[in-house]
Each structure stands twice: as structure tokens, then as C-alpha cells.
């Protein structure tokens, strides 16, 4: 996996860095991209979900609860690594805080939309009440339309007999 070096190495403990990535005299570890071996990158990395012939829902339910990555380990035991790790950790905490605020706003917004939709539906029902009183309930109209359709189908099949059954369906 090729990456921009320091981002992955900043999350690794110094002992987990492979020998080719350790600083050599005259070369900076952060100056070049490097291939990093697979393994945990941060202190709060989650394990992989179980794989197999399980349906996706059960795979999701077996997955451990999400932990937010707000703490990054220093790549080495020097001031620069500690400062970079602290900066990235602070950024992660701010991001987590903003994410929680956005989730709360989204929840309130969705709730307000649902309340607005409910009040709009009740206002529409109230405004439509005189029309329903004049024309009758929608269920009665639906039954009448179905009876007319059935009569038309029977009339198309047997024109003489269809008229006898139509009067039985009226209400």
C-alpha cells in the first residue's frame, strides 16, 4: 500500500516501523512515500468484521461498536512527532465534536420535517372535508368504479347478460 508516509507512520508505534523506513543519516523519514506493511495503524483501530456465508445483517450485528479515532500515537519519541500527533489528535477531537453537532442538527431537522408533514396532512384533510361530505367517502367511490369496470368487462364478453348484473352492485 503506497501512501504519503508520515500519515501512516504517525499512527504507528516506533517499534512497529520496518527497518527500511527508519531514519538513515542524511535522509528524512517524512520526505518520501513508502510502502507500509499491513497491521494496526492507530491506537483505536477496529478489528475486521467476521467474514463467511452469513447474511450482511448478521455480519453488521456481529461487528463491534464503533470507536472514534481521536488519539494518534507519536511515530517516534521526539518533540516533532509528539507535536504532530497532538495536532492530528486535536483535529480528530474537533471533527468528532462537529460530527456529533451535525448529527444532532440532522435529527432535529428530520423531526421538524415529520411534524410539518403531519400538520400539512391534517390541514389538507380538514380542508377536504366538505368535498368528501359532498362526494362521499373514497372507499364508496372505489367500489363504484370497480363495479363499473366489472360491468364493462362482462358487457364486452356477453353484451346481453352484462346489464342484468350491474344493478346488483349498486349501493
UniProtKB/Swiss-Prot annotation:
Annotated keywords: Cell wall, Host mitochondrion, Host nucleus, Secreted, Signal, Virulence
Location of this chain's protein in the cell: Secreted; Secreted, Cell wall; Host nucleus; Host nucleus, Host nucleolus
Motif (BH3-like 1): 73-78
Pfam families membership: PE
TM stretches of this protein: none
Region described as Disordered: 32-65
Domain PE: 70-126
Main location: secreted
Coiled coil (residue ranges): none
Superkingdom assignment: Bacteria
Family: Belongs to the mycobacterial PE family.
Reported function: Essential virulence factor involved in regulating host-pathogen interactions by regulating multiple host cell functions. Interacts with host TLR4 receptor at the macrophage cell surface and promotes activation of the canonical NF-kappa-B signaling pathway to stimulate secretion of the proinflammatory cytokines TNF-alpha, IL-12 and IL-6. Strongly induces apoptosis by inducing pro-apoptotic factors and efficiently activating the reticulum endoplasmic stress-mediated UPR pathway.
Protein name listed in UniProt: PE family protein PE6
